[in-house]
Amino acid sequence: MIRRIVAGLLAVSLGASAYAYEEITVTEGGTLTGTVTLQGQIPKPKGYNLTTLPDAIYCGRISDGRGWRLLQPFDVGGDGAFRQVVVLLEDIERGKAFGPYTPPRIEARDCRFVPFVNVVRDHHDVVVINMDPAMHDIQAYETSQLGPRVLFNVPLPISTRYPREAGLSAHFHKHFEGTPVTQTVKMTKGRHIFTMQCGFHAYMESWALVVDHPYFALTDERGRFQIADIPPGTYKVTIWHPYVHDSYERTVTIKPKEETTADFTVAVPTGRLYANQMVENAYVRYTVTEEVQSQIVPTLEKQTY
């Protein structure tokens, strides 16, 4: 089922490449560095009533203590350092080689897909691994203004090393690796956004920007990025995050063997950002016994916002 995480995010668009990227030897390349900062109060997280979804006890090891699981899409550090943002050179036709490809590894760990933001090369693989004693199901889509398209939908095997009671416990914190699932990402021409969600646990999301050249970076813990070996010239630089709808771009001129700086300040999105939000009544949809409520205990992480 295509969930509401796709709706409302289709305004995010990157220019479609009308050329095949050409790999060349770059000897006089320059470097682009900078930071991405989120300005304003960090939005409230998405909220999911654990009693309406499977594995409430095990997945409730990370929760707010009132039966809600939170998902904060905005990873922000001190001084507004905006982490897990992709910075990309647009429409670069030739440059350095990709180098050896290592498929992104996405783990289902503690009922989360980690990492939340990735970069994937088009027509190449991603590897997804279940580290939990709970059943997870990958539902992967490509998105654009024209709507989503299913890329693949496969279950994630559970490791046979888990004891049977592990998935029913709020106190089992060991992780064993299930059989890896490898899938090839093949995007429709002009589409660049890949999203993955668990079919059983709606709060498990992972996103990726799909690229056809190696001139990109993912911001670090301090919101910094660096892109090296850029052929001299003038380029458009853009940023991408799955929950930032406005476009941000800069024009930069790269000089031989010199460093150029481009900083981005992103305004906090306004309005209702998500379909799923926490409400004050912790068990708003169903009558839940005190026994079940008492079993949903944040023994691994008590979430706050």
Per-segment meaning from a language model:
Residues 20-305:
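Extracytoplasmic copper-binding redox domains, predominantly the cupredoxin/blue-copper superfamily
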Residues 1-6:
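Bacterial N-terminal signal peptides that target proteins for export
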Residues 7-16:
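Bacterial N-terminal signal peptides
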